Regions:
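Short acidic/polar hinge/loop motifs at secondary-structure boundaries
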Residues: 126-155
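N-terminal periplasmic accessory domains that precede
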Residues: 84-87, 106-109, 121, 136-142, ...
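Periplasmic-side early beta-strands and strand-to-turn transitions of outer-membrane beta-barrels
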Residues: 172, 181, 207-293
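Gram-negative outer-membrane beta-barrel transporters
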Residues: 360, 365, 402-405, 506-511, ...
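N-terminal periplasmic "start-of-domain" segments of outer-membrane beta-barrel proteins
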Residues: 47-78, 107
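Surface-exposed extracellular loop regions of Gram-negative outer-membrane beta-barrel proteins
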Residues: 415-418, 425, 430-431, 439-486, ...
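Membrane-embedded beta-barrel scaffold of Gram-negative outer-membrane proteins
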Residues: 311-329, 451-456, 480-537, 542-546, ...
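Extracytoplasmic beta-strand/coil segments of soluble accessory domains associated
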Residues: 85, 89-126
Length: 677
């Protein structure tokens, strides 16, 4: 892999530019054409069709028993969200694992089930990585390309959907769409940060007749040399993170055609490329690491939806994904002086389904998916493996007044193949039921109360790494099976036009059988196997309030809390919390939208965690809290709208680790200038 050229460390000139931009941002002078806060302060730079959450949409979701958490484009801007990981951390029940830095691996686990049980969709279709089994969220950090981020933890409101989208939890990423009411829209932005990062981006959308299309891209360079502290007994050593430079390029585009009748065709394509240095885990007395990683991924998908009759609806989609990963680690201990691991994956995916609603009280749907995945590598094993998966889902929904009952039965057939027939992974077949109950006990213009309950079973197939990786994988590994149940309530109250309150609470429980884990076979060799059961129980809650104290002023406040107990449920096991899962997670936010300078504050707090099942002082990760602040302001100059933002991350400079020996950055400053027309 070509070595990334050196990049100068930001100097006094850059810091001076930051200070100047910050001063302009905070200056309370009304520019020509300045809009009031309820227009300039609250309307996002991009006006997106179908993004605003209407009362009817929320009521429909609550009526079906769905537990949905959502951030649209407006909320992403007003809350000071700078990355997808930041957005997900504002949802209750989530925990993001971050290996540090802008290019570090980032995954999300819901209710402690693990990233492998979380489905991530982009543009309505599921993403996948058959080698690792988890989606790297850092590849989708371009918030400017997202119109909406949603989290579903019970069931989806739509009865007809691709079967792969029916997971233990679903994170839905909806890309930017052409704006409503405008023929064209363009947005350009430049972002810089105190760790030596710079990121220009560009998005354009246009509408012409029945067609609308959009295209965009983002480039990121980050030096990544942030400071951290190494503790060695009573001694401490201050260092800067080395070998953490990265470059990443994201390109995306799409088109939508709406027929005069009720058909809609959607096309979407996306490409992602990066080259990065891997800093590795922190070690005492050593600060050098020469690992490199280069990744490429492209995807193209097509979706078509049409109402064949007033009672019959058709949905079809197809998708192809190609990805390539190249890892190098120079070292005299390797044959030839370098360790090279190259992986290439292909996935072809197709889905089709019919939805039938003969009466207002009854609805049924059937969908089927076919997935074929292949992986090749330069290693002795897992060098030519493939898997074909056939999914089915039969669903029905019964509605009687304010009560809704949804039932699903999903079936899965797994067929594995390998160049060496003797080493093929086990085939599998499963039937898994779902049941969701929703009741809108109160629904008025001023108040609402919705109750829900659910039970569902899902399972996770072992990844290619768990089946085939040299001296680690085992072809005999069985899929994990998860059983989940929960009860929830959502209450909404709007006593006046100036005040709105929302309260949501859910109690959940889950049990995973045939847990896939690794056990030592010899001193230096580990092997993947099924062992034991895992139990997850807990509670999540969210409270939010919106206050309009005066004209052109709006106050937003909210808080979330998650309590989860994740332990090994085997009879002979210890009841201790499993690794990397905090028992308590809390967040709080405040925002003030006003005519002068908008303000957003975010606080995240996590209890102690452990890096292994043994709870000792050497495996303990200390509890921590992280405070962030954002200041931003908009100016309107005829058809041009400018936005300047200043963001302070980890304002208190807290030292913490999410993954053992991978320190996170302390104080960071980000400045962003955006122009839209």
């Amino acid at each position: 892999m070509t070595r990334i050229p050196p990049h100068p460390t930001p100097g006094a000139g850059r810091l001076g530019g930051m200070a100047l931009l910050l001063a302009i941002t905070l200056r309370p002078v009304v520019a020509a054409g300045q809009l009031p806060a309820d227009s300039a302060g609250t309307v996002p730079l991009r006006r997106l069709s179908g993004v605003e959450v209407s009362a009817s949409r929320v009521a429909a979701e609550e009526a079906t028993g769905s537990a949905v958490q959502r951030l649209d484009a407006r909320a992403l801007q007003e809350r000071g969200v700078v990355s997808l990981a930041d957005a997900l951390q504002q949802f209750s029940g989530t925990y993001v694992r971050d290996y540090g830095g802008s290019g570090g691996l980032k995954t999300v686990s819901i209710h402690g089930l693990g990233a492998g049980h979380t489905v991530v969709t982009y543009g309505g279709l599921g993403l996948s990585d058959h080698r690792s089994g988890q989606v790297d969220l850092s590849r989708y950090n371009d918030i400017g390309d997202l119109a909406e981020v949603c989290l579903y933890t019970t069931d989806r409101p739509a009865l007809l959907c691709p079967v792969r989208n029916l997971g233990a939890a679903v994170v839905s990423l909806n890309p930017l769409r052409p704006p409503s009411g405008k023929e064209r829209f363009t947005q350009a932005a430049i972002e810089t940060g105190s760790t030596g990062s710079i990121s220009p981006s560009f998005h354009h959308a246009r509408r012409s007749g029945a067609w609308s299309w959009n295209a965009g891209g983002r480039y990121l360079f980050n030096q990544g040399h942030y400071a951290y502290v190494v503790h060695n007994g009573v001694a401490t050593e201050r260092r800067h993170r080395r070998n953490s430079r990265m470059q990443a390029l994201t390109l995306s585009g799409g088109a939508v055609r709406r027929d005069k009748g009720s058909g809609q065709l959607e096309l979407l394509a996306r490409a992602y490329l990066n080259r990065q240095e891997l800093p590795g885990a922190v070690r005492l007395y050593l600060d050098n690491n020469d690992e490199r990683m280069a990744e490429r991924e492209t995807l193209a998908q097509l979706r078509y939806r049409r109402a064949l009759t007033p009672a019959l609806r058709l949905e079809t989609a197809a998708k192809y994904t190609w990805s390539d990963s190249r890892y190098t680690d120079p070292g005299a201990e390797y044959p030839g002086g370098c360790l090279r691991q190259n992986y290439r994956q292909h996935e072809a995916y197709a889905t089709a389904g019919l939805g039938w609603r003969p009466a207002g009280w009854f609805e049924a749907a059937y969908a089927t998916d076919v997935i074929h995945a292949r992986m090749t590598s330069n290693l002795e094993t897992d060098n030519n493996v493939w898997r074909t998966t056939w999914l089915h889902a039969l669903s029905a929904r019964f509605t009687a007044g304010a009560v809704s009952l949804t039932a699903r039965l999903t079936g899965t057939l797994l067929y594995n193949g390998n160049a060496a027939a003797a080493g093929r992974a086990r085939n599998a077949r499963r039937l898994t039921p779902w049941l969701t109950l929703g009741w809108q006990a109160i629904r008025t213009d001023r108040a609402g109360l919705a109750l829900r309950a659910h039970y569902k079973e899902t399972f996770r197939a072992p990844t290619f790494t768990e089946c085939y990786y040299y001296h680690y994988g085992s072809p005999q590994v069985r899929p994990e099976r998860a059983r989940q149940a929960g009860l929830g309530v959502t209450a909404r109250l709007q006593p006046s036009a100036r005040l709105a309150l929302t309260l949501r609470a859910d109690a959940f429980g889950a049990r995973i059988t045939d847990r896939i884990t690794s056990v030592p076979v010899t001193l230096n060799i580990w092997r993947t196997t099924n062992i034991g059961r895992v139990s997850s129980t807990g509670l999540e809650a969210e409270a939010a309030a919106t206050v309009r104290p005066a004209r052109n002023h709006r106050l937003e406040a909210g808080a979330t809390y998650t309590l989860q107990r994740l332990r090994n449920a085997t009879a002979t096991s210890s009841p201790l919390q499993l690794p990397y899962t905090p028992r308590h997670v809390a967040s709080a936010r405040m925002g003030w939208i006003n005519p002068w300078c908008n303000v957003a504050l975010n606080l995240m707090a996590f209890s102690e965690r452990w890096s292994s099942p043994e709870h000792t002082s050497g495996t303990r990760l200390c509890p921590y809290a992280e405070l962030g602040a954002t200041l931003w302001r908009q100016w309107a100059l005829r058809s041009l709208r400018l936005t300047a933002r200043a963001e302070a991350v980890n304002l208190a400079g807290t030292e913490y680790e999410i993954i053992k020996n991978y320190p996170m950055p302390r104080q960071q400053l980000r400045l962003t200038l955006t122009a839209a027309w």
